[in-house]
Regions:
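ATP-binding N-terminal substructure of ATP-dependent carboxylate-amine bond-forming enzymes
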Residues: 1-95
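Active-site nucleotide/adenylate-binding loops and adjacent lid/helix of ATP-dependent enzymes
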Residues: 4-5, 100-181, 211, 235-251
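Internal nucleotide-binding/catalytic subdomain
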Residues: 156-293
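Active-site "cap" helix and flanking loop/linker of ATP-utilizing ligase/carboxylase catalytic domains
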Residues: 246-268, 285-355
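Peripheral (often C-terminal) accessory segments that flank ATP-dependent C-N-forming ligase machineries
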Residues: 310-420
Length: 420
C-alpha cells in the first residue's frame, strides 16, 4: 500500500523510515518531509493546512493511508477532513485530539472517569490562581491549557516561581492564546515514564515503555524542552505496573472517549508518573512522542503499515504487535540557545549515515549544497541499538562523539536512571 506521513521532524523521519521497511508498504510520501527523509520517502511540497490541495494529491496518487505526525494538524481537524474524503487516517479527530490540545479538557475527563492524576485547579484570573498557589504551597506545577510545543509546563519549586509562571502565562506574553487559561496541579513525586499505545477506537495495544528526559541540562536541571533523549525499554515501568497503567489509565480513557462520542484512533501517549500509589497521568498526547518514537519504532517487530491501517479501520489485533528483546537509546543534539532560541545555518560535521546498530533521525536540519546545516532547536536524534541498554547507550554516545556543529548541546546522562 501507499502511505503518506504528515510532518518533517525527527519523529516523522522515524515513522517514515519504519514504514519504508514494512512488508505491507510499497511507497511512502512525506508532506512536506525533510531532505534527510529522501532515502525513505518521496517528498511532497504541500502545506498540510491547504487541506483541499492535500486531498487532491492523495486521491490522484491513490494513497491508502495517511499518518499524521505532529499535534497541530490533528488539533486543526486534518483527520476529520481526510475522513470526509474517505481516506483512512492514523490519528484522532479534532474532538479527540483535545486530549492534548486542552489540558483542562483532559483533566476534567480524567476526573469524570476516575482516572488517576494529580489534584488540580483551573484558572484564567491571576488573583484566583495565586490564592490557590498560596493555599497549596510548593512544589507545584503550572501548565498552559493549550499547545506550547512541550514547553508550556513549569515545575515550580517555590511559590514565587509559581506566581511568576502564572503572571507570564495569563498575561498572554508567553504562549498567547494557549496560555490564557492555566491548570495548576499538585506536584507528584516519583519517576516518569512514557507509555504509548496503538488504538483503533476500542482496542488498545501498548508499545514498549520508554523514558524521556525533558530538562535541557544533565541532572534534570534547567528549563523544560520538547525532550532531550529517551531510552526503551524503561525498567521503571515493570510488566506489573504496565498492566496496571493499561487497566486504570489507557483502557478506561479509550472507553471514556468512545462513550463521549469521540472515539480515539491513532497513537495514544500517556505520560506517567510512577508514584507510591501506582501510575498516575502527567499528561496525554494525541500522537507519537518525540523523541520516544525514535527508540520505540526500531524495537518493533510487527508490520507498522499493517498495524496503522488496522487502527485506521477498526481492526487492530494484539497479536499484530511484537517487540524485539533488545534496547534502544536516543540522544538529541540541540542548537545553541535552545529551548529559548535556536541557532540556524550552522554546518553539521561528521558521519550521518545509518548502520545496523545506529540510526540518525533529523529533527531540524536543512541540506545546503552537499552538507546539512542546523535548522531548528532540536537538530538530530542519534539512536543506538543493542542487546541491553548499556550497549545501546555506548553505541549512541560513540556516534555523538563523531558529530559536531557550532554551539551543539546535548545531555551526557541519558539512561542514567535505569542503572540506579
Amino acid at each position: 500500500m501507499k502511505v503518506c506521513v504528515i510532518g518533517n521532524g525527527g519523529r516523522e523521519h522515524a515513522i517514515a523510515w519504519r514504514l519504508s521497511i514494512s512488508p505491507s508498504v510499497e511507497k511512502v510520501y512525506a508532506v512536506p518531509g525533510s531532505a534527510a527523509m529522501k532515502n525513505c520517502a518521496e517528498l511532497v511540497g504541500i502545506d498540510w493546512s491547504h487541506m483541499d490541495h492535500l486531498i487532491r494529491f492523495l486521491k490522484d496518487n491513490k494513497v491508502d493511508l495517511v499518518v499524521v505526525g505532529p499535534e497541530a494538524p490533528l488539533v486543526a481537524g486534518l483527520a476529520d477532513a481526510l475522513h470526509e474524503a474517505g481516506i483512512p487516517v492514523f490519528g484522532p479527530s479534532k474532538a479527540a485530539a483535545q486530549l492534548e490540545g486542552s489540558k483542562v479538557f483532559a483533566k476534567d475527563l480524567m476526573k469524570k472517569y476516575n482516572i488517576p492524576t494529580a489534584a488540580y485547579g483551573v484558572f484564567s484570573n491571576v488573583d484566583e490562581a495565586k490564592q490557590f498557589i498560596a493555599k497549596t504551597g510548593a512544589p507545584i506545577v503550572v501548565k498552559a491549557d493549550g499547545l506550547a510545543a512541550g514547553k508550556g509546563v513549569v515545575v515550580a519549586m517555590t511559590v514565587e516561581e509559581a506566581n511568576a509562571a502564572v503572571d507570564d502565562m495569563l498575561s498572554g506574553n508567553r504562549f498567547g492564546e494557549a496560555g490564557s487559561t492555566v491548570v495548576i496541579e499538585e506536584f507528584m513525586a516519583g519517576e516518569e515514564a512514557s507509555l504509548l499505545a496503538f488504538v483503533d477506537g476500542k482496542t488498545v495495544v501498548p508499545m514498549i515503555a520508554s523514558q524521556d528526559h525533558k530538562r535541557i541540562f544533565d541532572g534534570d536541571k534547567g528549563p523544560n524542552t520538547g525532550g532531550m533523549g529517551t531510552y526503551a525499554p524503561a525498567p521503571v515501568l515493570t510488566d506489573v505496573l504496565r498492566d496496571e497503567a493499561m487497566k486504570t489509565i489507557l483502557e478506561p480513557m479509550v472507553a471514556a472517549m468512545a462513550k463521549e462520542g469521540m472515539p480515539y484512533v491513532g497513537c495514544l501517549y500517556a505520560g506517567l508518573m510512577i508514584t507510591n500509589e501506582g501510575p498516575k497521568v502527567v499528561e496525554f498526547n494525541a500522537r507519537f512522542g518525540d523523541p520516544e518514537t525514535q527508540v520505540v519504532l526500531p524495537l518493533l517487530e510487527g508490520d507498522l503499515g499493517q498495524i496503522m491501517m488496522a487502527c485506521a479501520t477498526g481492526t487492530l489485533q494484539p497479536n499484530m504487535v511484537k517487540w524485539k528483546d533488545s534496547s534502544a537509546a536516543c540522544v538529541i543534539l540541540a542548537s545553541k540557545g535552545y529551548p529559548e532560541t535556536s541557532s540556524k545555518g550552522d554546518v553539521i560535521l561528521g558521519e550521518l549515515v545509518q548502520y545496523d546498530t545506529s540510526i540518525i533521525f533529523h529533527s531540524g536540519t536543512k541540506l545546503e549544497g552537499d552538507h546539512y546545516v542546523t535548522n531548528g532547536g532540536r537538530v538530530l536524534g542519534v539512536v543506538g541499538l543493542g542487546k541491553d541498554l548499556r550497549t545501546a547507550l555506548d553505541r549512541t554516545y560513540e556516534r555523538v562523539d563523531h558529530i559536531t556543529f557550532k554551539g551543539m548541546q546535548y545531555r551526557k546522562d541519558i539512561g542514567a536512571k535505569a542503572f540506579k
